[in-house]
């Protein structure tokens, strides 16, 4: 295997060689086929695999998988990510187009989500697995027939599980590519934020609620329906973890807009290319193009301090980009933790605001009352039994449904003038 920059060799060679710092790739210089590091690596690879010795099919396959010369890097984790994500995508498209109605509640009430059943692109969704299945692993071979598997919502579980495996493998593939190119693994670390959010919503929450029927429908309107139902059940808007997630996402978007506008406003004009005298590792001097600044970091910081306040500055561009990456990643992590806690009905971290306050003996509703009324309304809409409507078109309600009956003795006591 080709020698890496960390002093390791692959299992194809069976031995290790010490790492030569002279072969390390300079990340600041463009990666071209004429670089000395690439030439050394190629020369070493030719020494390890002489042209006269034919390579076995397995060795050629391993070199093709781990080669960074491919147009798209495959990698060993890509061998797992590509088929799982492709399976999830194909089944999702087929289910959106032609999946039959699903017994989502396990009571015989069918819910349709496909386009052929009358839904449009907004209302179409992959309906979650039936509540009768619960958390059981429900592959195709566990059902008596394909029709039974479709009616019980088997495609939803297939899509979700393959998708989760695929995105985790994709994140590990990013780490693998960074390792091959001798880069730091922060790209893979940043991608853990959407992975954590997806796992929390699609896997952890159904597990905590006792069935995949509580999962998010895979569609546009299904996503918003899940959000409103989640708010009604757990009041996630009052969770500090969710609020930190909102701060991270919106704050990260604000910082990206500020950074992009400052950089665009301070871009330097392209100067004439100047040459600088540099000394190579062999001790000889050579002319090398001198790097020119892309934008003026000092002018951007001066503008920012003048516009906001004197302390609003960063010491270097590295600190700027670290904040741009760390703020949204930390926010999404905290929101995912909030969903995980809500999945197991652990709502003690949520803020409990008073339902009302009294000012001069006047009841003043708070925003908490508005949220509570919205939650109750969503609960009412989600009830399984629809209300009965009268001839006038208004729903009919019985007083006994909302007020407990009063006993005769209690009623006579309340109406007695001597009480």
From Swiss-Prot:
UniProt-annotated site: Tyrosine radical intermediate, residues: 205
Residues that hold a chlorophyll according to the record: 162, 242
GO cellular component, as recorded: photosystem II; plasma membrane-derived thylakoid membrane
Keywords: Chlorophyll, Chlorophyll biosynthesis, Chromophore, Magnesium, Membrane, Metal-binding, Oxidoreductase, Photosynthesis, Thylakoid, Transmembrane, Transmembrane helix
Disruption-associated phenotype: No synthesis of chlorophyll f when grown in FRL (705-735 nm, 26-30 umol photons/m(2)/s).
Topological relation to the membrane, as annotated: Multi-pass membrane protein
One GO molecular-function entry: metal ion binding
SUPFAM superfamilies in alphabetical order: Bacterial photosystem II reaction centre, L and M subunits
GO terms under biological process: light-dependent chlorophyll biosynthetic process; photosynthetic electron transport in photosystem II
Residues carrying the site annotation Stabilizes free radical intermediate: 234
Annotated InterPro entries: D1/D2 (IPR055266), Photo_II_D1/D2_sf (IPR036854), Photo_RC_L/M (IPR000484), Photo_RC_L/M_CS (IPR055265)
Assembly, per entry: Homodimer.
Function: Synthesizes chlorophyll f or chlorophyllide f (Chl f, 2-formyl chlorophyll a), probably by oxidation of chlorophyll a or chlorophyllide a and reduction of plastoquinone. The reaction is probably light-dependent. Chl f absorbs far red light (FRL, 707 nm in 100% methanol), and is synthesized when cells are grown in FRL, where it provides the advantage of extending the spectral range of harvested light in terrestrial cyanobacteria. Chl f synthesis is probably light-dependent.
Protein family: Belongs to the reaction center PufL/M/PsbA/D family.
Protein name as it appears in the record: Light-dependent chlorophyll f synthase
């Amino acid at each position: 295997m080709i020698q890496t920059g960390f002093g390791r060799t692959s299992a194809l060679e069976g031995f290790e060689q010490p790492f030569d710092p002279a072969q390390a790739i300079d990340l600041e210089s463009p990666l071209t086929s004429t670089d000395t590091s690439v030439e050394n690596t190629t020369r070493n690879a030719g020494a390890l695999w002489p042209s006269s010795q034919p390579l076995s099919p397995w060795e050629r396959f391993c070199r093709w998988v781990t080669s960074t010369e491919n147009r798209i890097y495959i990698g060993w984790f890509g061998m797992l990510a590509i088929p799982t994500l492709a399976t999830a995508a194909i089944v999702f498209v087929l289910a959106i187009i032609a999946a039959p109605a699903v017994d989502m509640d396990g009571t015989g009430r069918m819910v349709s989500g496909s386009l052929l059943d009358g839904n449009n692109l907004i209302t179409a969704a992959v309906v979650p697995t039936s509540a009768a299945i619960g958390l059981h692993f429900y592959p195709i071979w566990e059902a008596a027939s394909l029709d039974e598997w479709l009616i019980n919502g088997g495609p939803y579980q297939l899509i979700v599980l393959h998708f989760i495996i695929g995105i985790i493998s994709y994140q590990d593939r990013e780490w693998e590519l960074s390792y091959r190119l001798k880069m730091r693994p922060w790209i893979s670390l940043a991608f853990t934020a959407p992975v954590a959010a997806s796992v929390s919503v699609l896997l952890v929450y159904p597990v905590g609620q006792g069935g995949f029927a509580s999962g998010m429908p895979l569609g546009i309107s299904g996503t918003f329906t899940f959000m409103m139902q989640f708010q009604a059940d757990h009041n996630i808007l009052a969770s500090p973890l969710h609020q930190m997630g909102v701060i991270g996402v919106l704050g990260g978007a604000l910082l990206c807009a500020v950074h992009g506008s400052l950089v665009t406003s301070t871009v330097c004009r392209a100067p004439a290319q100047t040459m600088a005298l540099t000394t190579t590792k062999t001790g000889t001097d050579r002319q090398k193009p001198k790097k020119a600044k892309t934008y003026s970091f000092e002018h951007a910081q001066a503008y920012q301090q003048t516009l906001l306040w004197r302390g609003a500055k960063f010491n270097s561009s590295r600190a700027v980009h670290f904040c741009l990456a760390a703020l949204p990643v930390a926010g999404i992590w905290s929101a995912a933790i909030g969903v995980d806690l809500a999945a197991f009905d652990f709502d003690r971290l949520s803020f409990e605001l008073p339902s009302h306050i009294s000012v001069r003996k006047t009841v003043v509703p708070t925003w908490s009352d508005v949220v509570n009324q919205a939650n109750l309304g969503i609960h009412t809409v989600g009830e399984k039994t629809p209300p009965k409507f009268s001839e006038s078109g208004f729903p009919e309600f019985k007083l006994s449904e909302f007020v407990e009956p009063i006993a005769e003795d209690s009623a006579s006591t309340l109406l007695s003038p001597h009480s």
